[in-house]
Amino acid sequence: MQKDSGPLMPLHYFGFGYAALVATGGIIGYAKAGSVPSLAAGLFFGGLAGLGAYQLSQDPRNVWVFLATSGTLAGIMGMRFYNSGKFMPAGLIAGASLLMVAKVGISLLSSPHP
């Protein structure tokens, strides 16, 4: 007989999609321009975002890795977008990061505290 471990939390699909977008951006930057720093940063931040999304799917209050990752990327890529004026890739990642910060922040503020 299998023991019931309670309800499972749903996967954080938006978070995993965001992590895939960030990692894919790094891979594309490497493929198009041969930029090793772009590859390293994309895989690093994509991995952190994936870890944060996994943590969110396990406990919706465990937002700190995901929030720090998306907030850092919003700041870095927002400055790159401001300085270059190019939407791809800096504007896209900055916008997606801001949306993720807003989504997680709103869900954190609106959830009941134990």
From Swiss-Prot:
GO CC annotation terms, alphabetical: mitochondrial inner membrane; mitochondrion
Presence of keyword Mitochondrion: yes
A GO MF term: transmembrane transporter activity
TM regions (residue ranges): 8-28, 33-53, 63-83, 89-109
Compartments (UniProt record): Mitochondrion membrane
Gene3D superfamilies per record: Transmembrane protein 14-like (1.10.10.1740)
Membrane topology value: Multi-pass membrane protein
Superkingdom: Eukaryota
One BP term from GO: regulation of heme biosynthetic process
Keyword line: Heme biosynthesis, Membrane, Mitochondrion, Transmembrane, Transmembrane helix
Matching InterPro entries: TMEM14, TMEM14_sf
Keyword Transferase: no
Principal localisation: mitochondrion
Function, in words: Required for normal heme biosynthesis.
Family of this protein: Belongs to the TMEM14 family.
Protein name: Transmembrane protein 14C
Protein's organism: Mus musculus
High-level lineage: Eukaryota, Metazoa, Chordata, Craniata, Vertebrata
